């Protein structure tokens, strides 16, 4: 499966400008099967959901559907959504064959996200081209129990607005998640400065199941990151090094 990830700046709380920007990027994109966008790719990481949130079937989801159909590609990215009186940081998954979503479970309290958005309660794993992909958002990366591989996924996706001062944690934890879960990991972060003056260095990466980079970006630089992943290679490694057989049993409560 061919992966493309967009490390990009974001126009602050400006859906139309961001959608136009990404439309142009996607039109220039080479052949790919899966496209991964940053967290809150239409607005930036805003704690003003009453200003930016859209309906569950809003313009961003319609745009994702259009892009998926036009380019015959699966596409994923998160947006602020209002549904049943609550706001969610919702990661949409749209492919030509299916559609799903994951609501961010771990809300970033240091920015007050937990006071503005409701937490999702369940993990979401989707299937595409023979791979099982687990959808996660930013702060979820810090919680290995929640994103632990229960022998139910092959690719772990993190979309993020992860600030530059904590870039070491971002890179280190992505590598750890790949190694401990024997899974490909895609980590996509934004670059530039947001409306609150917070800077983002990007450091987006696609890792193999050994934690080794298949593709990585230059910090602070907009980029299209591409790599190809192999299910046969992943299965071969898991058979030769079946660490999951010695994993401790646990359950989430």
Predicted stretch roles:
Residues 59-73, 142-222:
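CN hydrolase (nitrilase-like) catalytic-core segments centered on the catalytic cysteine
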Residues 7-12:
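Short polar catalytic/cofactor-binding loops
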Residues 1-5:
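Extreme N-terminal starter segment of soluble prokaryotic enzymes
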Residues 33-34, 133, 155:
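Structural motif
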Residues 77-79, 90-93, 124, 204-206, ...:
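Short beta-strand scaffold segments in enzyme catalytic cores
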Residues 15, 23-95, 100-101, 163-177, ...:
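Cys-nucleophile CN-hydrolase/nitrilase-fold catalytic domain and related Cys-dependent amidase chemistry
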Residues 82-151, 165-172, 236-243, 253:
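Active-site catalytic loop in hydrolytic enzyme cores
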